[in-house]
């Protein structure tokens, strides 16, 4: 590795994991599913335990076939990785390199600029609009002959705002066919906006679209690490070529298969989280907090210069959210009692 390359790596910010301290701490910082794994998923993992002396199948054929059947696509269109973040990294390495550019909204998923630089490409962040949505016109204007990939995050992390089908279709009309548009839909299960885009509906007419999803959020498999992309067979094949071997464990593959078979139970839990999201939003709005309506399993509090003080108050009450100094606080939706503690902590912060 050259000295210049080492300097780039050493200059990368470390990804900041959501904080949690102490036995009685309430961790609302990582957008995790607060419910324990479904019994059928635990059973599937348990059955797999005696076999983890063997490597997982690199082809991941069974889980890819199950995903394909669930979403009505061909298995050749599905690629998997150890979480959607790894699949995003695969996309960048497969499609971009030195001298290339990757466009994404900002603020958005904080791994985007890190992964872009690791791939050797140049990050092109495009600021959100004043209402914290993607500025699609500005993103289209940012396209150059060096653009290789564009990320759209819907619902957006950390603001919870969504893109609508009509505006995405208009945006795609401005994107060259050789530029890949990644629809990062990690939080799509929590969306209740009928106008919101579903990336899967775009694939037939837009072969440069890739849909990125995960089992970490709604499915509750964050600790097992499995995500997937659905795209053209050609792009999926490229992803498998650059993937690190054996990263998607046998346990993760079987848990994902079992999760897709438990859709009714999954939806019941998601509906409970969405109901709590509405309750917490209403309570905090009554307290006077400035919150954008969210279609994810978290809320964004625009706290600006007061962010660090509010965070200190929350931590003093044992409540840990994800904070960005001078910008805002992302509060994950947890169990009812956990949300009650967050509401109480924030009521004390607003008094301060």
Swiss-Prot record:
Residues annotated with N6-(pyridoxal phosphate)lysine modification: 217
InterPro entries according to UniProt: Aminotrans_II_pyridoxalP_BS, Aminotransferase_I/II_large, ArAT, HisP_aminotrans, HistidinolP_aminotransfase, PyrdxlP-dep_Trfase, PyrdxlP-dep_Trfase_major, PyrdxlP-dep_Trfase_small
Enzyme class: transferase
Pfam families assigned to the protein according to its UniProt record, in alphabetical order: Aminotran_1_2
GO biological process: L-histidine biosynthetic process
Keyword Membrane: no
Cofactor(s) needed by this chain: pyridoxal 5'-phosphate
The EC number(s) this enzyme carries: 2.6.1.57
Transmembrane segments: none
Keywords of this entry: Aminotransferase, Pyridoxal phosphate, Transferase
Keyword Isomerase: no
Catalytic activity entry: an aromatic L-alpha-amino acid + 2-oxoglutarate = an aromatic oxo-acid + L-glutamate
GO MF entries: aromatic-amino-acid transaminase activity; histidinol-phosphate transaminase activity; pyridoxal phosphate binding
Record's function text: Aminotransferase that catalyzes the conversion of aromatic amino acids and 2-oxoglutarate into corresponding aromatic oxo acids and L-glutamate.
Similarity-based family: Belongs to the class-II pyridoxal-phosphate-dependent aminotransferase family.
Self-association and partners: Homodimer.
PANTHER family cross-referenced by the UniProt entry: HISTIDINOL-PHOSPHATE AMINOTRANSFERASE, HISTIDINOL-PHOSPHATE AMINOTRANSFERASE 2
Name recorded for this polypeptide: Aromatic amino acid aminotransferase
Gene: pat
